[in-house]
Amino acid sequence: KIFFFFLIVGFHPSYSVALNIKKLIQEKRRLENLTKVKVQINRFHFLKFSFPQSFQMLEQIGITSDYSLGYSHYIGFRASTCTPFYFYDLVQDRISSLKLHPLVIMDVTLKKYMGKSSEELFDIMSEYAEKIKEVNGEFVSLFHNESLSDDNFWSGWREQYQKAIRYISLLEIYDKEEALEKSR
C-alpha cells in the first residue's frame, strides 16, 4: 500500500486531450482513483495548450493551478512575469479560479533547442533565480526524470541540477553571497 502523506499529485494529461474535455475528465478521474488524492494541479504535455479553451476546461474539471505557461524553445517569462496570476477569461470577461504559474526553465529547452551544456546549467539557473528573488517571484523549472538519470545524453546534468537547486533553496533564506558560500 502506498501512503501519500506529504505529496502533491499533479495531473499531466496525455498529448491528445488538450482540447477534449471528456478525455480530460476521464484521465483525471483515473489518476484520482489510483492515488485516492484530489488532483488540483496540472501541466500539459509538451506545454501544448490552446488559449483560452484549455484553461477553461481545466477550471471546469476542478484544476486550480497550471504550470504549462512557458516556452519550449527558449527560457524566460512567456507571460512577462514570474509571479503567479489568475487566468483572465476574455470570452467570459471574468477572472477565473485557475492560477497560472509561469515556467521559466526547462531541461530540454536548454540542451536540445539552445545547445547548452551541463557546465552552463548552474550559471543559467542561478541568474534567473536571483532575478526572480529581486521581485519576490516564483521560480518554476521543469526537469524530466531522464535528464536527471545521468545517462550518456544527459551526462553531468544531475550533478549541476542538484548544485543549482541547493543554491536556489539557500537563496530563499540568505542573500546571494551567503547562499553561494553555503551551497559549496
For each of these PLM feature ranges, what is it?
Residues 1-39:
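Acidic, glycine-rich loop-and-beta core segments that form the ion-binding/anion-interacting portion
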Residues 4-6, 119-184:
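C-terminal domain-boundary segment and adjacent tail
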Residues 11, 44, 141-143:
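Conserved beta-strand positions
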Residues 14, 101-106, 143-146:
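Short loop/turn segments at strand-loop or loop-helix junctions that form parts
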Residues 30-135:
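Active-site-adjacent pocket scaffolds in enzyme catalytic domains
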